[in-house]
Amino acid sequence: MTVLSEKKCIPCEGGIPPLEKKEIDKLLVQLQSKWQVNELGHLYKKYKFPNFVKAMEFANKITEIAEQEAHHPDLTISWGACSVEIWTHKIDGLTESDFILAAKIESINS
């Protein structure tokens, strides 16, 4: 099995169904972290930091990955925290690329 963080995000042009719950659950296990699927059906994780500057530095690292992968999460930055929400906008659901991006984000601090 290929590690998610070693894969590339594939741009979605729509016309495909979102992942089913069974597939989502398998991919969540592969992330091996505290990512969740929120009430909107998006991948979500809140990272905590000792201050605003560290949260912003983390967000900037995510920006670099997002640009490389051409897949962009929603980020909410506050004092001591950066929340990340990922989904494939074209289908308003989750694809494997969402999990690939989450894995790459997860590797920032490892």
Curated annotation (Swiss-Prot):
Catalytic activity: (4aS,6R)-4a-hydroxy-L-erythro-5,6,7,8-tetrahydrobiopterin = (6R)-L-erythro-6,7-dihydrobiopterin + H2O
Pfam families per record: Pterin_4a
GO biological process, one term: tetrahydrobiopterin biosynthetic process
GO MF entry, a single one: 4-alpha-hydroxytetrahydrobiopterin dehydratase activity
Record EC number: 4.2.1.96
Annotated keywords: Lyase
Enzyme class: lyase
Record family assignment: Belongs to the pterin-4-alpha-carbinolamine dehydratase family.
Identification of the protein by name: Putative pterin-4-alpha-carbinolamine dehydratase
Organism: Rickettsia felis (strain ATCC VR-1525 / URRWXCal2)
